[in-house]
């Protein structure tokens, strides 16, 4: 089932209702890329994005990071260090409003 994004669908099927491929979850809004920082929670990963912010006083760049909780469907096998693409969706819980739609690259630790 197509979700309206140019991503590769997972080969494994799942029975998760909050899966954009095999369930009824619709995606809309932003699509972001980041690195999986934590997989400790059940069906949830923390995606970390680093970016630079200019500090005008010192005329330098400062590193910042954002940590976004995202739903990880069972059909997408993730590990810490993987590069993933996440898409915005309706609020799934108090903090989750994104879902993992594609695993771009593995972290190399296999």
From Swiss-Prot:
GO terms for biological process: translation. SUPFAM superfamilies: Nucleic acid-binding proteins. InterPro entries: NA-bd_OB-fold, Ribosomal_uS17, Ribosomal_uS17_arc/euk, Ribosomal_uS17_archaeal, Ribosomal_uS17_CS. Disulfide bonds: none annotated. Coiled coil: none annotated. One of its GO terms (molecular function) is rRNA binding. Keywords: Ribonucleoprotein, Ribosomal protein, RNA-binding, rRNA-binding. The keyword Ribosomal protein applies. CDD domains: Ribosomal_uS17. One of its GO terms (cellular component) is cytosolic small ribosomal subunit. The keyword Ribonucleoprotein applies. HAMAP family: Ribosomal_uS17_A. Part of the 30S ribosomal subunit. Belongs to the universal ribosomal protein uS17 family. One of the primary rRNA binding proteins, it binds specifically to the 5'-end of 16S ribosomal RNA. This is Small ribosomal subunit protein uS17. The gene is rps17.
